[in-house]
């Protein structure tokens, strides 16, 4: 179980290149949510949540479903995921969110 939050592709919430995630992929800035990409804290990478891994997220109501790890969070965070969403979705923090790694066959 992890804590989940949302983030937007803006310099204030990312870095100087908000249109590119840590894996090197580029974000569709008109509709970032369509990618269903997440950022993960460094400690979760050691548990198998590495770039390209697909996961099933449950416990966030309308944002539940299949997402892909493509970004990395600031090192100050632990046991946390961040869902890339459109600017129209504001605020959100959920505790005890389940993240299930899907089979290697589901890797992008």
Where do the protein language model's features map onto the residues?
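Solvent-exposed, well-ordered loop and adjacent helix/strand elements within mature globular domains
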Residues: 1-108
């Amino acid at each position: 179980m992890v804590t989940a939050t949302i983030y937007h592709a803006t310099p204030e919430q990312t870095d100087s290149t908000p249109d590119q995630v840590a894996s090197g992929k580029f974000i569709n800035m008109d509709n970032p949510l369509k990618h269903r990409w997440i950022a993960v804290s460094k400690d979760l990478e050691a548990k198998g949540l590495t770039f390209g891994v697909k996961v099933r997220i449950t416990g966030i109501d309308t944002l539940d479903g299949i997402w892909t790890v493509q970004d990395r969070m600031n090192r100050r965070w632990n046991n946390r995921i961040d869902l890339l969403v459109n600017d129209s979705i504001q605020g959100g923090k959920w505790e005890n969110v389940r993240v299930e790694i899907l089979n290697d066959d589901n890797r992008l």
